[in-house]
Amino acid sequence: MNQDKIVIKGAREHNLKNISLQIPKNKLVVITGVSGSGKSTLAFDTIYSEGQRKYVESLSAYARQFLQMMNKPDVDAIEGLSPAISIEQKTTQKNPRSTVGTVTEIYDYLRVLFARVGIPYSPTTGLPINSQSVSEISDNIINKNKDNKAYILSPIVRDRKGEYRKEIEELKLKGYQRLKVDGKIYEIDEVPILKKNFKHNIDVLIDRLVIKENIQQRLAESIEVGLTLSDGLIYLENLETNKITTYSSKFACPVSGFSIEEIEPRLFSFNAPMGACEECDGIGIEKYFDDKKIIPDDSRSVLKGAIKPWETKVFGYQKKFFVETISKILKEYKVNVKTPWYKIPQDVQNIILYGDQDNEKKFISSFEGKINFIDRKYSETERWWVQYELEKYLSERDCEVCKGFRLNTKALAVKIAGKHIGEITKKSIDDCFSWFNKLKDNLSNNENKIAEGVIKEIKDRLEFLNRVGLDYLSLARASKSLSGGESQRIRLASQIGSGLTGVLYVLDEPSIGLHQKDNQQLINTLFKLRDLGNTVIVVEHDEDAIKQSDHIIDIGVKAGIHGGEVIAEGNLKKILKSTKSLTAQYLNKKKQIAIPQKRRKFNKNKIFTLQKIKTNNLNNLEVTFPLSNFICVTGVSGSGKSSLIIDTLYKRLDEYFNKSLNREENYFNFKGIKNIDKVIDIDQSPIGRSPRSNPATYTGCFTPIRDWYAGLNESAARGYKPGRFSFNVKGGRCESCEGDGVKKIEMHFLADVYVECDICKGKRYNRETLEVKYNSKSIADILDMTVEEGFDFFSKIPSIKQKLKTLMEVGLDYIKIGQSATTLSGGEAQRIKLSKELSKRSTGKTLYILDEPTTGLHFDDVNKLLKILHTLVDEGNTVIVIEHNLDVIKTADYIVDLGPLGGIKGGKIIGKGTPEDIANIKKSFTGNFLKQILKIKE
C-alpha cells in the first residue's frame, strides 16, 4: 500500500464514471469543475464518507449507536485513508446556546481565566468583595481593635419585613441569650413584638470581650459559631469607637449582603444552573408579543382590521365583541372608530394594547388590553395550532434581567480589569484580541503567572479568527445567525487550534462570503492546517486558491451525465496544458468574463433613494440606486452589505408593497418608489424543508406534467384526474411508503436505515398509476430524469418545456426534476428560485435582490449567470447583488462600496459609482483589486 497517497479505484457514486486516481497526502488539494460535475460527490460522498465509515466501523457496537452511520459509497476501493473531518457550509449550528465562543472553545478558556484571576465586585457599592478564613478574620480583629471592648454579632435578619417570632423562639431553644434588634441590645425574653410591615435587622450577640492577644482561641470559636449561624457573615462592633466591621468567609458584600459561594468555571457557564440567568435560562433573549406584528399596517382602522389576530381563526369568532369594546374606549376618548391606527393618540393606543392600569375609566376597569389578552391565551392554551398561530406575533429582545449576557448577577459580578465575562464576549474579535494584548499590564505578577497559559490559548484562537477574515464577529454571536461561509471558517479556525495531525480535512468552498482582501490569509490558514501534517481537500472555485494549491483535480467536462470524469490533475503547470479543461481555459485567459465595453448610464430621473439607514452598524446613511442598472454592493465581510440590502432595502420595500394600504413613501424613508412595482429577494434558503419538495413542485413545472398525464387516453379511460399523479395525497401514490419511496428502519445499535420501499421499488406511486405512460415513460420515470433529459423529452409541449428551459438557463440542467429539496445546495436553491422568476412575465419595473449568487459556481457558470442577470436589466428591471467575486463586480453598471472594515469599524460608504470610479478610490479595498483587473494605471 502506498503510504504517501490516497488511492481511489473505480468510484461510481452518483454521476462519477468509474474514475480512479491518486491524491497526494499532506498536501493542499483543490477539486474544481463546473457545477454538477461531481466535485462534491468525489470529495464528500466518496472520500469523506468512506473515511468516516471506516473510522466508525472500528468502534464498539455500543459507541456506534451514538454516531451517524455512513452508507458505503459506490467505489471498488479506497486505500490510504486517514480519519476524516468534514467542514461543510451546511453545518451551521441551530442550537440557540451555541455561540462563536463555544464553538471555538475560547469561551471555555475564558471561564477558567475568570475563575482563577477574576475579582468579585458588589453590585450595590461597586467595591471588590473578598473571602477570609477564620484565622484571617481573627488576626484582622486583633490587629485593628487591640485592648478595645467589642461585640461579636451574627446577622440573622437584614432589612426584611416580618414579626420573626418563630425565628427568635428557635434561637432561644439553641441557648442564645441576647439579640440586637434594630440597633438595640435585648435579653432574648424581652424582645418587643415587631411590626409586621416594617423592615427589621436582627443580630445574635455571640460574645462580649476585650480584644487581646491571649484570647485568640476564644475569638476563633466565637467567629466560627457566628459564621455558621449566619451562613458566612459576622459583625465586629467596637464599643469604644462605635464602628461596625463586616467579615465574611465567603465572597460577600458587607453592605448589601450580596455573596458568591464559590468562583469556579461552571459559575460562568450559561448552560449550567449555577451560572445561567434565572429569567432566560441562559439564552440571553426573551420573547414578547410585538405590537408592530399585531398591528402590521397602522394605516388601517380598528374597523378595517388593524389588529391582525382578530382576522384569524383563533379569535375571529370574538371579533365583533372586541371591536365593540374598543369602540367604547375610542368613544370615551373622543376618537372616531374609523380613525387610522397611527392617528390614534399614543395613550389611547396603550390602553387598547395593554389595558387601563390606573382604572381611570370605570367602565373599562376590567379591560386587560389586547396584548395582555393574547399573552394570557398563549400561556393557557393546550392547543398546538393556537400556539403556532400566535407565535407569528412574537419577537425577540435582550433579556431584561441579564441584558443579553446570558449569565446571572453573581457571574457578572466577577471582573478582570474592570470587565465582566459578558462584556468581553460582546467585543468584536479584533477588539477582544487588542484587550488581551494589554491585559498583562492590568494583572499582578502572581495573576500573570496563573493566567499566562490560558491567555495564550485564547489569543492564539482569536488570531486564527482574525486571519480568516472574521475580526468583525463577537464571541457572543449566536452560531445560528452565521452564514455558511462564516460557520465554516470558524470551524476551520477551531481545528487549527486543536492541533490535530494525520487527519484528512474536506472543506466546501471556504472562501464564500470572503472579500479578496482576506483571501490570502484564508489560503495561508489552509497551508498551516496542511503543515501540521494533515491532508486538506478543498472543493473550490477561487482562482487564487486553485493557483496556490499543491495538487489540482478538475472534474468535468460538463455537469450531470456529461460530467463525472477526471479531465485533468496535477500541479498548476500540468493543468494549464490541458486542452479539455474548462478551468484551464479560464486560468490561462483563453476564456474569460468580458468587461462591458459600455456601461448603462445613471439616469437622474430614474433613481431610488434610501434615507436614515441605521440598521446594525450602518451610520445613518443615505444611498441612491440608479434603476434599470446592474448594481453591486461590495465591501469586506461585516461591513454592512446585508444590513443595507436585505435588512433595510428589502424589508422597507416588502413592507410598503405587502403590508401598507395608503402610507406615503416618506413614512418609509425612501424616494422614487414610482419606478418600482415589486421587489423580489432571491436568497439561498431551501426551496422546501420536506424531502417531497423538489424543483418540479417549486417551479410549478409538475402541475403541467400531471395535467399532461391526466389528459392521456389511458387516464381518461380509467377516470384519472391530475390529483392521481400527486405523491402527496392518497389515490395514486404508494400507501406503503406514503409517496416517499423509502421506509425508515430503526436499528438498536446502529443509526436508522432508510431502505427502498419494497412495494413501489422507490417509484413513489402505486402500480395502477405507473401503468399510465407517455412515450414509454411513467410519471416516476419523469421525476427521475435530469432537467436536460426532461427538456428533450417534452420538447413538443411548450407549457412544460418552457419551465425546464429556464432551469437550464441558470445552469441546472444536471439536477433531477424530482430531486429532493433537502439534497440541494444553497446556490442551487437560489438558482431554482431565479429560474422561477425568469419564467414569469417581466414588468420592467421589478427590483431583484441576490446575496452572493456566485456561491458554488465555476467561472463558466458565473459567465452564464451574468448573461441572465444582464438580460433582466435589459428588460428595464433593476438587479442588486451583494458580491465579492471580482468577475461579477467588474461587469456592474454601478457599485456601492461599504467599509472601511467590518463591525463597528464599518458601516460607511467608501465609494459609489462605476467600477472605474471605485478603482480610483485609494482607501477602497475593493477598488485596489478592481484596479488590477481593469488594468488602470496610477
What role is predicted for each listed range?
Residues 1-938:
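Conserved phosphate-binding elements of NTP-dependent enzyme cores
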